Design a protein with these regions (language model features):
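Conserved tyrosine-mediated DNA breakage-rejoining catalytic core shared by Y-recombinases
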Residues: 25-130
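Basic, Lys/Arg- and aromatic-enriched nucleic-acid-binding interface segment
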Residues: 1-20, 207, 211
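Short, basic (Lys/Arg/His-rich) helix/loop patches that form interaction surfaces
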Residues: 128, 148-149, 156-213
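Alpha-helix-centered segments that form part of catalytic cores
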Residues: 1-7, 119-143
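Active-site/pore-lining binding-face segments in mid-to-C-terminal subdomains
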Residues: 56-72, 81-89, 139-140, 155, ...
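Extended hydrophobic secondary-structure segments that form protein cores and membrane-embedded regions
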Residues: 42, 139-144, 176-177, 211-214
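A short, glycine-centered helix-capping/turn motif at helix boundaries
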Residues: 12-25, 191-195
Length: 214
């Protein structure tokens, strides 16, 4: 079960170029609907993105399918078990309304404050709960075996553990989150170069010579 969650997490990272903290703080509501197109997209807010670099993030259909399967099966399973244990009872300090996009926070003595979810930091997002007919559950996309949000430090540990297993098995493999982002950059550059070469091939020899001189 958790191998499939981890695989979906890694595939999403290497195919989108998201940083570890950015991806670890995603909410279920960030996951776009599966469409008939090759890519779907979601908006990464400046409060989450490093250096405030808000942007559209494009997710390949195959990766989105795996993430959606995790949400519908593995994630839902741990949420049900956590509810049955009463883990979420009373967790109403910060409740996120997915329809309005606002978070209602209890700031003391019953006083409520409302803010847009897009203004929250990664740490604040991991504290959010959502309420449905079935009850409360974390708003976070990535949940642990106990049904609680997976911290950034835990993801780093998972990479370290995977690298240690590779060493123990004699496999010459090593990976970390930043390497996946570099891989995304290299693959994207290669695709751009292929597209550029394909466009050049459509030009007449005279046009190509003018392009070279420029």
């Amino acid at each position: 079960r958790w191998a499939s969650r981890n695989a979906a997490f890694v595939d999403l990272m290497v195919r989108t170029g998201l940083r570890l903290t950015e991806q670890a703080s995603l909410l279920v509501s960030d996951v776009p609907e599966i469409s008939g197109r090759g890519y779907s997209r979601f908006w990464l807010s400046g409060a989450v993105a490093k250096w405030g670099s808000a942007r559209w993030v494009y997710v390949p259909a195959s990766v989105l399918s795996d993430v959606s399967a995790y949400v519908d099966i593995d994630r839902q399973s741990v949420v049900r078990m956590a509810r049955s244990r009463g883990d979420y009872e009373g967790s109403t300090q910060a409740v996120f309304n997915r329809e309005s996009g606002f978070v209602t926070t209890v700031i003391g003595d019953g006083v409520l404050a409302r803010t847009r979810v897009g203004n929250l930091s990664p740490t604040e997002r991991l504290r959010l709960m959502v309420e449905s007919d079935e009850g409360l559950e974390p708003a976070a996309l990535w949940l642990s075996e106990t049904g609680h949000p997976v911290a950034v430090s835990t993801w780093k540990d998972l990479f370290r553990q995977a690298n240690a297993r590779c060493v123990a098995k004699g496999a010459k493999l090593h990976a970390h989150a930043h390497l996946l982002r570099h891989t995304f950059a290299v693959l994207t550059l290669e695709q751009l170069q292929r597209g550029h070469i394909a466009e050049l091939s459509k030009l007449l020899p005279e046009q190509r010579s003018q392009y070279v001189r420029v």
